[in-house]
Amino acid sequence: YYKTIARINELEPTFEKMTDEQLKAKTEEFQRRLQGGENVFDIQVEAFATVREASKRVLGMRHFDVQLIGGIALHQGRIAEMKTGEGKTLVATLPSYLNALTGRGVHVVTVNDYLASRDAEWMGKIYRFLGLTVGCIQNHMDDRERKEAYACDITYGTNNEFGFDYLRDNMKYDVESLVQRGHYYAIVDEVDSILIDEARTPLIISGPSEEATDKYYIANDIIPKLQRGHKDEETKVTTGDYIVDEKNHSAVLTEQGIAKVEKLLGISNLYDPANMEILHCVEQALKAHTLYKRDHHYVVQDGQVIIVDDFTGRLMHGRRWSDGLHQAIEAKEGVKIERENQTLATITLQNYFRLYEKLAGMTGTAETEAEEFATVYNLDVIVIPTHKPMIRKDYPDVIYRTLEEKWDAVVKEIQEKYEKGQPILVGTVSVENSELISERLKKLGIPHNVLNAKYHAREAEIVAQAGRKGAVTIATNMAGRGTDILLGGNPEFLAREFLKRKEINPDEATPEQYEEALREAKAIVEKEHEEVVALGGLHILGTERHESRRIDNQLRGRAGRQGDPGSSRFIISLEDDLMRIFAGDKLRSMMKWLGMEKGVAIESKTVSKQIERAQKAVEARNFEARKYVLKYDDVMNKQRETIYGLRRRLLFEKDHREYLVGEHGVARDLLHDLTEMYLNPKVPRYNWDVDTYAAEIESIYGVDPAVDAGVDFKTMSPAEIEERIWQKAYANYEEKEKIIGAETLRAYERFIMLNIIDAQWKDHLLSIDHLRQGIGLVGYGQKDPLVEFKKQSFDMFQEMLDRIDINTVKALFNLQVVVRDEQEEIERIERLKRQKARRGAAAYTSAYEGVAAAGEESKKHTPFVRKQPKIKPNDPCFCGSGKKYKKCHGAES
């Protein structure tokens, strides 16, 4: 790394002497060299020197040597761990520019829309100066805007937007409507949050299913009638109707509970396959009542259950728990139960980001999860040194017995810092706790800001000023990530505030007005900066340890940026969730031994180590949970790649004739398989299933073997029969092609195949969901559920591929071509003219539209001879969707 940096630094004087035009011309030079056979590593040193110089001229910011190290690590496809305030946003410009020169597109992934638009605008100035284009994906954009953004050299957006665009692209019916153009290189900002915290939640595009919701009310009424029990770890004896294990986040019925549920439902065996659906509802209702707490895991607003994000405390509008859990909670809360959604497309974030040829990430805290990054994503973590030495003081944890004692101590510490003038940032794990502290501070008359993590842009403004003298800011742990807390405040944000006070819109202010406000702000900030440094910098106060050490480290990392002074402390109690569930018994006995009294805190490194051990245990458990999700999704991933690969081939290749009706096409292979199945040459002719074979052939190919193809089952060999049928079916197909034209038929083929693939894939995903729900039961038969899942899902996938082939051939060979002759068309027009004369112009218009839409009125004198039997309402629909005709195209007609 240091040799490369030395070479970049050597070029700096040369680049400083260049004019703007000469510097901009470097982009075209690099692109020419790449086209001439050089690779990105050959031009890395010069490209980095170019970006550094452009940044100095455009933003007035020069990349430090440690930022160059970060840039090199990212270009190599690694994770750069850089402490808060070390300029991660600027670091990303180096590898983004270099890799964008290939013309294949670079994706910069952020945690929210606000940061995506802020960084695209802010860093975009460098890229635009150097002649590259920059796009930004925002939640509200339509397909046209998204396509334009993806066509840019560098595209900013959130992980969800990138992932959902990928899924939506794989549901499109023509190439022009695709928005993404491939997955070459991605830089993931706050990589730990995106690739680890959110990795257990798959991205799902869903539509309403046809399942009824009353079963959730039935299950919900049963739970209050059950008694909670417990399991004696020594004797293994269980009591009560169900056991709740908070540590493993599970709730299960006991033998006694199963018997009681069976009695309440009036069934003999709850585990009978016929009762699997109600069993699943009872299990989810039990979880809803015992493991999910209102105002902690979710809130009820406007008659809806809205999930609260564990990590940020944000309300996750539009997100729903899957597997019937959301419906169970809706039943518990007595709100309207929304129909369970059926999955149309899904992918985990792990498998989405594995699509990229090269992946890199940045964060302030990745070292604790290095093993997971290596195992799942094959990414190394490189710890980048800080530009200036870290001088923050991290004090040991202070532990109280009860929550009440803890909150008293928290408020007391806030009051002390406020009276001294030292800025303090208080981190909480939930919105509920933020409001609790806020109420107490109001009673004491202490002014403060509360970040309830709902508005990212407003968050940035509050967080930016959290370093001002006497500032008290309460925030959920992760709120306002991506914005630095500058001691004394942020002059740019303060200048905007001054303009607003003068009733001037900051975005419409003249350069003179803005400069004046900025000068005023800088003078105040510089004075306050010195005062805050003298007081010890920003103090971080954590009010509860998070399950993940990384989240605690992120909170601490808000102080002590770029060599600034700062301090941090956690005040916790034995009644906190983490302590109660994971470290309770050992710590309680330790506290007794230490002689802990009411209102007296203890500071002990031994206790802090005990807490860290508890956190490591939780992290290990969560890692296992993510690995478990990934193992199952890996099975699906192979299937998804096959289906999406087939779809893309259909979209991008214009001619599928050979694939469908060629010598070794789908239709010919299917005919061969059917002939082998029913007319096996290895068995005597009298054992052939001729009737079923003839019915299948007529159903799929629209050919009666005996009548249309002249087949004699008594004398012909299977090969001759197959050849006869194929000649007739193929001739019919060619006839249709002559009538409607090759181009029209190719378009129809593509539409039909995509339609059938989507319908079958949707049904397959539903079947897989059901399989996954019940697969755990095979463990009782001493079988590995994962192995069994792989086996059964593979068989189901093969069956689905067979259905796709059969339905495609059936739809194409049974295509009805209706041709209206010239005389008929003349008569139709004459009839319309007579109608016009009788009813007047207005009625004519109406009649014309009606006839044009129906298209059949004009043919009443021509007898219609049906080649195929009439489709009855309950028959499967001809389009291959798998639905009944009356619920599919029958409903439309």
Name each region found by the language model.
Residues 421-434, 652-654, 658, 710-714, ...:
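Short, Lys/Glu-rich amphipathic helical modules
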Residues 175, 864-865:
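Short, P/G- and charge-enriched loop/turn segments at secondary-structure junctions
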